[in-house]
């Protein structure tokens, strides 16, 4: 497992297989619709668990029974609990969650995470933009410089990493622009370095948006 985590391309798969083996031993069953969602049902007792790499989110209808179950799991897997999460106004993995049980309304956004990223990259002065990618932008590998500038590459990777996290969770319409620029992570040219800025301008435009719905 240690070699899989740090030395193999198939590390994510090995890690997930390890988690499946441990949690299935303790009654959790992986769902068909989502391999990262597990469910345990014993009579009226229910546990649902979502997995993101090494972060786990549990929901249950019986905290007392869950605590006893969780203690048994820790004998096979070294995990710790961060405590219970109040969904109203809480943040989980940079996701800001607004929950109105009476109205059956749920909204997930990343406005705080985006604001923090904008400050980190020094983009506070930039105007917002209505599109995540400027029209006519086109790069090829021929545009990549022969000499790699490590600092420039690091900045480009960090911008794309942040943008990818937002686009995958709450800003799906930016996915194409992020994926396109990610093709040039190894050696971005100066014009390429400017391209992700447009994505962050778009994030400023849609900062209060997110994923919302009633159920």
Could you say what each language-model-derived stretch is?
Residues 1-215:
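Long, low-complexity, charge-biased intrinsically disordered regions
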């Amino acid at each position: 497992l240690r070699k899989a985590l740090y030395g193999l391309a198939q590390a994510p798969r090995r890690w997930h297989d390890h988690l499946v083996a441990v949690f299935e031993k303790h009654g959790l069953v992986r769902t068909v619709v989502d391999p990262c969602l597990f469910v345990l049902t014993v009579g009226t007792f229910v546990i649902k668990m979502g997995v993101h790499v090494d972060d786990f989110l549990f929901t249950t209808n019986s905290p007392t029974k869950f605590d006893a179950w969780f203690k048994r799991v820790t004998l096979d897997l070294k995990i710790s609990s961060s405590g219970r999460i109040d969904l109203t106004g809480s943040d989980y993995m940079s996701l800001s969650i607004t929950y109105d049980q009476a109205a059956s309304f749920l909204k997930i956004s990343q406005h705080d995470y985006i604001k923090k990223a904008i400050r980190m990259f020094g983009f506070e002065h930039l105007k917002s933009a209505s599109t995540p990618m400027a029209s006519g932008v086109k790069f090829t590998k021929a545009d990549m410089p022969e000499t790699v500038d490590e600092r420039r590459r690091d900045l480009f990777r960090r911008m794309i990493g942040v943008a990818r996290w937002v686009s995958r969770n709450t800003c799906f319409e930016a996915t194409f622009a992020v994926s396109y620029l990610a093709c040039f992570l190894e050696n971005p040219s100066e014009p390429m370095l400017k391209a992700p800025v447009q994505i962050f301008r778009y994030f400023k435009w849609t900062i209060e948006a997110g994923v919302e719905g009633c159920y």
